[in-house]
Design a protein with these regions (language model features):
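Active-site activation/catalytic loop segments of kinase-like enzymes and analogous catalytic loops
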Residues: 169-176, 246-286, 301-321, 333-340
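Conserved NTP-binding catalytic cores of kinases and kinase-like/nucleotidyltransferase enzymes
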Residues: 1-107, 116, 206, 220-234, ...
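Conserved catalytic-loop position in the HRD/HxD motif
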Residues: 211
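ATP-binding pocket architecture of kinase catalytic cores
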Residues: 46-47, 56-163, 167, 173-178, ...
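ATP/Mg2+ or Mg2+-diphosphate-binding catalytic cores
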Residues: 3, 309-371
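Catalytic activation segment of kinase domains across protein kinase-like and atypical kinase folds
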Residues: 215-260
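Hydrophobic packing residues in well-ordered alpha-helices of helical domains and bundles
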Residues: 81, 130-137, 161, 186-189, ...
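An alpha-helical support segment within catalytic cores of ATP-dependent transferases
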Residues: 25, 31-34, 149-154, 160, ...
Length: 371
């Protein structure tokens, strides 16, 4: 779960823990300064993320700016970023252009999509004002999905789904909550995970961004006109993309890691996505084409997998990696988990388990009632 490379407007100086890497970076940047009209003395921190990557901003002599990705090769593989950026560009999306890449050292020079994220533009109390940006996000998402081809990206398969789900008991329950599950509770999780995986693997597949949300979508500067609707927003943090359930990214967009919308707005945007996807031929599966409710139930099951995973990831980021800011958002995911579990009879045991761990009462229902 990464922050966008242009998040915030920080002008913090760049600090280095390894003198050798600092020297290597300085030499690399200087070597590209003339070709790309860079001003190396202007380098400052743009953002860091949940991984070991960080992003630096550097000015050009013409008054523009560029982004440098610092991805230590012993900790981060920069190749997926380069490869998937090309896929997104081929799909017609607005993504950073790779101007220079040193794979051996883990340095990339990128075009700068600016500092204005969709998240920064959103007032959580005003969904009407946010709606146009969400419609733009849908255009980008559909263009990405329609470009899908099998065998291009790694599969979001059973092994990946289960590995992600296991983060919840390993890190959220055991490490963060300090709870040792009973044999019965462990059996509940095993059965629940089996159900989730079964549902997710049955869904139609396509390209999956995996963190398609407002923090990773960039608003163009005023006066900059996109060539197509799919390019209205810039797209970042795509290096972990896979080929998997097409429900994943709409679930990620509407059940945000850092922002909670009321159910009416979630349904409104998801219906708009469904209508567009249906016209594009993406809903030709079982009764999805004619029944929004059937599609939405699939979105909820996919979202449940993501919520369990992210709760575990956020706990791990805090406890293992020392990034305490993420833990503050875990209650949001527990709310998502409980609300979804309350709606489905098969998930009643999961709801009971979560309530036992959290010391909470059962959540209220959602728009379609209990099924």
């Amino acid at each position: 779960m990464n922050s966008p490379l242009a998040a915030g407007t920080s002008a913090a100086p760049v600090t280095w823990t390894e003198p050798a890497r600092e020297a290597a970076f300085g030499a690399w940047l200087q070597a590209h300064a003339a070709e790309h009209t860079l001003a190396p003395e202007s380098v400052r921190l743009a953002s860091a993320d949940a991984s070991f990557r960080r992003y630096l901003r550097v000015d050009t002599t013409s008054g523009a700016s560029r982004i440098v990705m610092d991805a230590p090769p012993d900790k981060e593989n920069s190749e997926p970023f380069v490869r998937i950026a090309a896929l997104l560009r081929e799909a017609g999306l607005h993504v950073p252009e790779v101007l220079a890449w040193d794979q051996a050292q883990g340095f990339l020079l990128l075009t700068d999509l600016g500092q204005d994220t969709m998240m920064a533009r959103i007032n959580p109390e005003d969904s009407a004002a946010a709606a146009p940006m969400y419609r733009q996000a849908l255009d980008a998402l559909l263009a990405w999905q329609l470009a899908s081809r099998p065998g291009v990206l790694p599969a979001y398969n059973e092994a990946v789904l289960r590995r992600e789900l296991q983060l919840f008991p390993d890190w959220y329950i055991a490490q963060h909550k300090g709870v040792a599950l009973s044999e019965a509770q462990s059996a509940t999780l095993t059965k629940t995970f089996d159900l989730i995986v079964l549902r997710c693997l049955a869904m139609p597949t396509g390209y999956v961004h995996r963190d398609f949300m407002p923090r990773n979508l960039m608003v163009r500067p005023d006066g900059e006109t996109p060539a197509t609707p799919a390019q209205a927003l810039g797209v970042l943090d795509f290096q972990d993309a896979l080929h998997g359930p097409i429900t994943y990214d709409i679930a990620s967009l509407m059940r945000d890691a850092f922002l909670t919308w009321d159910e009416d707005f979630v349904l409104d945007v998801t219906v708009r996505y469904w209508e567009k996807a249906r016209k594009a031929g993406l809903m030709d599966f079982e009764d999805w084409h004619s029944d929004f409710g059937a599609f939405y139930r699939a979105v909820e099951w996919m979202g449940l997998q993501r919520h369990l995973k992210v709760a575990g990831i956020f706990a791990r980021l805090t406890l293992r990696d020392g990034k305490a800011k993420y833990l503050a958002d875990t209650p949001r995911f527990i709310h998502y988990i409980r609300s979804t579990a309350h709606r489905y009879r098969e998930l009643g045991p999961l709801l009971k388990l979560i309530d036992e761990i959290e010391g909470l009462q059962a959540a209220s229902g959602w728009a379609f009632g209990r099924v």
